A protein has these predicted regions:
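A detector of single, family-specific signature residues
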Residues: 1-288
Length: 288
């Protein structure tokens, strides 16, 4: 059917499920569901807002954010897997560099581990030979070269003990782990870029991006989980939606003074809010 002939609404199914639920009988059929949807729509007609292009973008953004969260967990698992293997071939190799992932998902410590996958790849060379090899590697991979860093890596390699031998089988194990991590990391960075592009089409984008503690990654994530902010009538509604509103425990004359947050809302939104607050605590912006 043509979109022009129908008015479309996006409604939380939980609202429909709980609507008019005042019968002792529990009926579950397509006919009963259709009647319930119709009754809810007629009863709430004046409050419903028509589904729009902005809603489609928000739905896409939220879907991408859930995928982003999934692949971030996968990336963390692949990272831990690679580190556990490196502990048996080149302990500490993952700690030499802390530069963030590039747009293609590549990371210096991962690329370093792919080339110098065993500690013997470093210490079997002379110091000058390693410095020369490392410098050429940095140039080829377009990473910054530091002679002092090269010396530090070489000197540290003399004290390390490897468990797995330096052979083709061990190299293959490392290669597979690196490839899996790179694939997950690349997907994460692609989603990060796509989410920012989608979020930039929404009217609230400039306001959100101007907030302290929010950047091109957390900003779109925040927008994805909150959705259309205009549907909230007051600030308390947003805190309740996130589940960070204080709970209430009262009965008769008893009133609990300290009650944990309700946590009835979106756990993904709470996670994003926690990350924003973590940035604020660490950066401590003066004019915030």
């Amino acid at each position: 059917s043509s979109r022009r002939r129908h008015t479309r609404f996006a409604i939380n199914p939980k609202l429909i499920k709980d609507f008019g639920d005042n019968s002792l009988r529990k009926v579950k059929s397509d006919k009963a569901d259709a009647v319930k949807i119709a009754r809810y729509t007629l009863d709430s007609w004046t409050e419903l807002r028509q589904y729009s292009l902005m809603d489609e973008i928000r739905n896409q953004l939220k879907t991408m954010n859930r995928q982003f969260d999934f692949y971030m967990k996968h990336k963390t698992a692949m990272k831990n897997n690679l580190i556990s293997i490196l502990d048996q071939t080149y302990p500490g190799a993952n700690t030499y560099f802390d530069s963030p992932a590039r747009e293609d998902g590549s990371q210096k410590w991962v690329d370093f581990s792919a080339t110098y996958w065993h500690v013997d790849c470093v210490r079997k060379l002379s110091l000058n030979a390693f410095i020369d090899h490392y410098q050429k590697w940095c140039k080829r991979r377009k990473y910054n070269f530091s002679r002092s860093k090269a010396v530090e890596i070489y000197e540290a390699s003399k004290e390390l003990v490897s468990i797995l031998p330096k052979d083709d089988l061990t190299k293959l194990i490392i290669k597979q782990a690196v490839e899996q991590l790179n694939t997950a990391s690349q997907t994460v960075e692609q989603l990060r870029t796509m989410m920012n592009e989608a979020a930039s089409k929404l009217p609230e984008y400039p306001v959100v991006m101007a907030m302290k503690g929010v950047g091109k990654s957390l900003g779109p994530q925040l927008m994805a989980e909150i959705g259309d902010v205009s549907r909230f009538t007051h600030k308390g509604a947003i805190t309740a939606f996130a589940g960070v509103d204080p709970g209430v425990n009262e009965s008769g004359s008893y009133e609990q003074k300290s009650v944990p947050a309700s946590k009835r809302g979106s756990s993904t939104l709470r996670k994003t809010l926690f990350q924003v607050m973590d940035v604020l605590i660490k950066t401590k912006p003066q004019d915030d």
